Amino acid sequence: AGLDAGEGGAVERLRRIFPLLGDWFAQDRFYGCPFINAIGEHDKAEDRLRAITIAHKKAVLGRIESLAMEAGAHDPNRLAHQLGLLIDGAIVVAMISRDPGAARLAAEAAESLFAALERSA
């Protein structure tokens, strides 16, 4: 399920990120990302919590980077971090505004990255 559901190449799977986020944001029990929330609400010197959050972010970015590499990105790590910023921003905006449309806005911003990736591949 998720990114690997159905047909499509790596770029298509990357594009699936944002509709999946939109589905998550539309759930009644969406309260944002527990990792972002935990860092925001706890002692900034809490290294254990930060380490757990960083490990989660690395896993997410690693999955995105592997798809970016498969798609032929010139700099898969950079693309993963760019998409990660859009993802995290959409999560925070959706949490604050209660508007699942934040995922669509992030998808529109990501589209220029995907178009450049398709042109270079």
Language model: regions and residue ranges:
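Hydrophobic alpha-helical connector segments
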Residues: G2-R29, E70, P76, A80-L83
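Alpha-helix boundary/capping and short turn/kink residues
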Residues: E7-V11, R29-F30, D47, K58, ...
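Amphipathic alpha-helical segments used for helix-helix packing
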Residues: R13, Q27-D47
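An amphipathic alpha-helix signature
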Residues: R15, K58-L61, E65, A107, ...
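Short alpha-helical scaffolding segments that buttress acidic/His motifs in well-ordered protein cores
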Residues: F18-L21, F35-I39, L83, I87-A90
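Hydrophobic/aromatic-rich alpha-helical bundle segments in the mid-to-C-terminal region
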Residues: L49-A55, M69-A121
